[in-house]
Amino acid sequence: MAAKIRRNDEVIILAGKDKGKKGKVTKVLTTGKVVVEGINLVKKHQKPVPALGQQGGIVEQEAAIDASNVAVFNAATGKADRIGFRIEDGKKVRFFKSNGETVSN
């Protein structure tokens, strides 16, 4: 299946503890998950590595969230929107299903 959610897309969270929040996609994983900036923060207990000069402690970082729990945010309508594909000038482009506008990459 084609990637309907891509890196740097503005998305809104549909389910989970961060429901309703907006953020930018920083990474899309092949397992069908995405990492969103500032969303799904978890605390990781990190061991110190003196050889590399890394300090130990509790580090807060973003965890992956399933792609089915996010939707691309349409700034024109101010809501979450579905994505479709069409061919324009011989190129495959993404568009919003609600208003037909092309999604900027």
From Swiss-Prot:
Q: Which domain of life is it from?
A: Bacteria
Fetch the Pfam families from UniProt.
KOW, ribosomal_L24
Q: Cite the InterPro entries for this sequence.
A: KOW, Rib_uL2_dom2, Ribosomal_uL24, Ribosomal_uL24_CS, Ribosomal_uL24_KOW, Translation_prot_SH3-like_sf
Q: A GO molecular function for this record?
A: structural constituent of ribosome
Keywords for the protein's UniProt record, in alphabetical order: Ribonucleoprotein, Ribosomal protein, RNA-binding, rRNA-binding
Name a single GO biological process.
translation
Q: Which GO terms describe its cellular component?
A: ribonucleoprotein complex; ribosome
Summary of the function given for this chain in its UniProt record: One of two assembly initiator proteins, it binds directly to the 5'-end of the 23S rRNA, where it nucleates assembly of the 50S subunit.
Assembly behavior: Part of the 50S ribosomal subunit.
Q: Family per UniProt?
A: Belongs to the universal ribosomal protein uL24 family.
User: What is the protein named?
Assistant: Large ribosomal subunit protein uL24
* Organism this protein belongs to: Vibrio atlanticus (strain LGP32) (Vibrio splendidus (strain Mel32))
What does the record give as the organism's lineage? Bacteria, Pseudomonadati, Pseudomonadota, Gammaproteobacteria, Vibrionales
Which gene produces this protein? rplX
